[in-house]
UniProtKB/Swiss-Prot annotation:
This is Competence-stimulating peptide. The gene is comC. One of its GO terms (cellular component) is extracellular region. NCBIfam families: ComC_Streptocco. Signal peptide: none annotated. The keyword Secreted applies. The keyword Secreted applies.
Length: 41
């Protein structure tokens, strides 16, 4: 369960960072999903 908590904290941190960046709002959701669910090659 420790990993889950760390992931949630990491996501919350990224959300704060993304909120600061108001330039490319349309791209942010895609970037955020790449962070949370990395694409398998």
């Amino acid at each position: 369960m420790k990993n889950t908590v760390k992931l949630e904290q990491f996501v919350a941190l990224k959300e704060k960072d993304l909120q600061k960046i108001k330039g490319g709002e349309s791209r942010l959701p895609k970037i955020r999903f790449d962070f949370i669910f990395p694409r398998k090659k």
